[in-house]
């Protein structure tokens, strides 16, 4: 096996029945490609469906729900262990609510084969409902602002663009790509410890992409590949639990990566001394995280004043859990990173607050954002 395409399923039997046949057909002629379903202890008959309608597809059935992060980590570990010397070179994480197009996989394999510096790549993500329009979760590749707010080429806040090929000829490198469909180099995934299981679900792919870049790899979008995403297959957009995960995990992601990123900026542009750069990077990261938490507090007040009490509580609980779960920033770890950081570049971090730029300055499409406003690390 060269490429393992893995659906992590939890109670999405209907999506499997609808979209799995097309996925199987799409990779049938690709040598070394195998579709695998890992089930997170579903209670809707998903495993029975696999046994009865798709006996040719390998199914890994977990006894409990490990979440998106733990489920994929455990699935990949089992696949690698069973494969032995034939372990896959690439893993594809793909949601059950994805409809693939013909020839979606080949361009990604070709890109990864010819670009060993690429740690992960993804197709363009279109809406399943509006097929000429980007989909919220990933569009044409993700960026992030200096406070950790993600946005995309083709989607800023809630404004989603039609795909008219406007981003097809841009530099394919982005900051993150959606976990709805993400091809990762298995060796890199393993070296980085996989997905951070503290996240459970949501934002974990952005954290992984950030860690890949800090390890010297790039993240790319492949415009010759397009898939169609239903979205909200596991948690609806209005779910307070989803809101909780997004707020908490964004802070965990900043805690994981921001100090190293700022220290790299100081080290490369101002002070080639690891200890000074590490101190300044940690100070800047801690200040940014405090500012982000104040911003979250403002959004919590908006929820309260608009009588969205469950959303208000979700933000408060997210901050409480973050304080319990954060690892903290270790100066020695940052210094060790800097000593081994030659050639590492972090791109596509927007130097302004994207929420303010969108709401006050009407920057609702990615083309309206100036390239000079991105940090150069």
Regions found by a protein language model. Give the residues of each.
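Conserved donor NDP-sugar-binding/catalytic core segment of glycosyltransferases
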Residues: 98-149
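Short beta-strand/loop segment that forms part of the nucleotide-sugar
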Residues: 32-41, 60-62
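Short beta-strand-to-loop acidic/aromatic patch adjacent to the donor-nucleotide binding site
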Residues: 86-99
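A conserved acidic beta->alpha catalytic loop
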Residues: 22, 39-48, 64
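Glycine-rich, basic loop-to-helix element that forms the pyrophosphate-binding segment
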Residues: 62-83, 107
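Active-site-adjacent helix/loop segment of glycosyltransferases
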Residues: 6, 215-335, 343
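A short, conserved alpha-helix in the catalytic core of glycosyltransferases
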Residues: 167-226
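Short, acidic, metal-binding catalytic loop of nucleotide-sugar glycosyltransferases
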Residues: 21-32
């Amino acid at each position: 096996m060269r490429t393992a395409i893995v659906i992590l399923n939890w109670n999405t039997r209907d999506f499997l029945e609808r979209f799995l046949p097309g996925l199987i057909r799409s990779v049938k002629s690709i040598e070394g490609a195998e579709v695998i379903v890992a089930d997170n202890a579903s209670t809707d008959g998903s495993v029975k469906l696999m046994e009865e309608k798709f006996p040719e597809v390998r199914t890994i059935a977990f006894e409990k729900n490990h979440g998106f992060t733990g489920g994929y980590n455990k699935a990949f570990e089992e696949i690698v262990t069973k494969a032995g010397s034939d372990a896959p070179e690439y893993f594809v994480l793909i949601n059950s609510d994805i409809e693939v197009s013909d020839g979606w996989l080949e361009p990604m394999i070709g890109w990864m084969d010819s670009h060993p510096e690429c740690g992960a790549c993804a197709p363009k993500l279109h809406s399943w409902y509006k097929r000429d329009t980007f989909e919220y979760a990933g569009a044409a590749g993700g960026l992030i602002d200096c406070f950790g707010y993600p946005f995309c080429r083709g989607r800023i806040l809630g404004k989603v663009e039609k795909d008219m090929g406007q981003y097809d000829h841009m530099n394919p490198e982005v900051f993150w790509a959606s976990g709805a469909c993400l091809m990762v180099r298995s060796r890199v995934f393993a070296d980085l410890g996989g997905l951070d299981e503290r996240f459970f679900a949501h934002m974990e792919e952005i954290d992984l992409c950030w860690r890949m870049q800090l390890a010297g790899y790039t993240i790319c979008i492949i415009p010759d590949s397009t898939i169609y995403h239903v979205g909200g297959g596991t948690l609806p957009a209005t779910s307070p639990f989803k809101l909780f995960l997004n707020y908490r995990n964004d802070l965990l992601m900043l805690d994981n990566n921001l100090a190293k990123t700022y220290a790299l900026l100081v080290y490369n542009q101002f002070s080639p001394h690891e200890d000074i750069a590490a101190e300044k990077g940690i100070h800047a990261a801690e200040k940014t995280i405090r500012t982000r938490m104040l911003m979250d507090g403002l959004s919590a007040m908006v929820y309260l004043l608009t009588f969205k009490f469950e959303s208000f509580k979700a933000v408060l609980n997210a901050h409480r859990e973050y304080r319990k779960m954060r690892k903290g920033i270790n100066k020695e770890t940052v210094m060790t990173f800097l000593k081994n950081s030659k050639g590492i570049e972090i791109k596509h971090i927007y130097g302004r607050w994207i929420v303010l730029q969108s709401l006050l300055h009407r920057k609702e499409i990615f083309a309206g954002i100036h390239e000079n406003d991105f940090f150069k690390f």
